[in-house]
């Protein structure tokens, strides 16, 4: 997806032999990929690359505020950080961060670090996410 975004194409740029801790997003030619790229262009969605270390940092930071997500879901946090720093996302903008995959889907990540389990207050979800984005990467 990122390669298509960077190349300004309207179709997926297939790849193979790619390994990442974020296994859920390693398919080299995802089903529906061309449609996603079409929507991304139509609605001016942004895309950003993240390193393996950045994925793990994001997963850990999300876990610290009560969101145990798989590495693939955690990629969005650091990507948003980079887009803010590059001023591609302006202060006060509405940003949607998809956290769809539970950390229980990919327990291999524990070989990189240990996470502590904590309770999260559902009424504070929006505040937690905004505080995370505003304060965690100062």
List each language-model region with its residue ranges.
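Active-site/ligand-binding loops adjacent to catalytic centers
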Residues: 1-69, 112-138
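Generic beta-strand/beta-sheet core signal
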Residues: 50, 70-72, 98-100
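Substrate-binding/catalytic subdomain of NAD(P)-dependent oxidoreductase enzymes
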Residues: 55-83, 93-94
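Catalytic phosphate/nucleotide-handling subdomain of diverse soluble enzymes
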Residues: 77-138
């Amino acid at each position: 997806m990122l390669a298509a975004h960077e190349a300004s194409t309207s179709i997926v740029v297939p790849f193979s032999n790619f390994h990442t801790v974020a296994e859920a997003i390693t398919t080299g030619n995802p089903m529906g990929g061309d449609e996603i790229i079409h929507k991304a262009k139509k609605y001016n969605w942004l895309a950003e690359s993240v390193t393996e270390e950045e994925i793990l940092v994001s997963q850990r930071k999300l876990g610290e505020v009560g969101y145990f997500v798989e590495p693939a879901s955690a990629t969005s946090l650091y990507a948003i950080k980079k887009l803010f720093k590059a001023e591609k996302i302006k202060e006060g903008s509405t940003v949607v961060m998809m956290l769809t995959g539970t950390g229980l889907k990919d327990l291999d990540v524990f070989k990189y670090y240990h996470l502590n389990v904590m309770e999260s207050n559902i009424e504070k979800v929006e505040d937690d996410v905004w505080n995370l984005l505003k304060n965690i990467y100062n």
